[in-house]
């Protein structure tokens, strides 16, 4: 009996993990906040150093985190922002994606999905740690939890700790409108 319960618990945990990586999250509400945005740099898909402070100076900045490049949920999240990129750009919004993936994986993901924004390769988790993004599967794999931040004037003004996938851009547009 105890063995069956252990098996059931293990299966439920595996299902939850797989859903968080591959599944579709519902639209996140997020919360308005106000604290200094992390000043850090990372390496993009092309190997160039991206200084986040320089990006923040260009205008409102969306920094979104995702577990794994090329997986269904992460693709929906990134493509939501890709499809709204022209509208976001008109508002002066910069977009940066971050995951633990290696540079070559980020480069492939960007090319495959025709993403018009940088993807930060963060295999050591320095950017993830700077933003205090939770890690999934600690000790087993390095996967960032799906989260999104909106930065204005060097301050994080909105944080969605359970960021949506297909509705990511709609959430950001809504928050931008509320902040005007």
Task: Set out the residue ranges of the language-model regions.
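Bacterial N-terminal signal peptides
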Residues: 9-23
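Short, internal strand/loop/helix patches
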Residues: 96, 113-145
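Thiol-/selenol-based redox modules, centered on thioredoxin-like
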Residues: 143-180
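Short active-site neighborhood of thiol/selenol oxidoreductases, capturing the structured segment around
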Residues: 52-75, 81
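Structural microenvironment flanking redox-active thiols in thiol-disulfide oxidoreductases
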Residues: 75-115
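N-terminal "domain-start" segment that seeds a small globular fold
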Residues: 23-53
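Bacterial N-terminal signal peptides that target proteins for export
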Residues: 1-11
């Amino acid at each position: 009996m105890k063995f069956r319960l252990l098996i059931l618990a293990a299966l439920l945990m595996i299902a939850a993990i797989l859903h968080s990586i591959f599944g579709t999250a519902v639209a996140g509400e997020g919360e308005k906040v106000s604290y200094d945005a992390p000043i850090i740099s990372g390496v993009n898909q092309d190997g160039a150093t991206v200084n986040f402070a320089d990006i923040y100076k260009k205008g409102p900045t969306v920094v979104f985190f995702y577990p794994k490049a090329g997986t269904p949920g992460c693709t929906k999240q990134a493509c939501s922002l890709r499809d709204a990129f022209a509208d976001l750009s008109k508002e002066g919004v910069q977009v940066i994606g971050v995951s633990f993936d290696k540079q070559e994986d980020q480069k492939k993901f960007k090319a495959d999905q025709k993403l018009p924004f940088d993807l930060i390769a963060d295999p050591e988790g320095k950017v993830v740690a700077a933003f205090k993004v939770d890690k999934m599967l600690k000790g087993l794999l390095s996967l960032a939890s799906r989260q999104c931040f909106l930065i204005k004037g060097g301050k994080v003004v909105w944080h969605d700790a359970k960021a949506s996938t297909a509705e990511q851009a709609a959430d950001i547009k809504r928050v931008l409108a509320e902040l005007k």
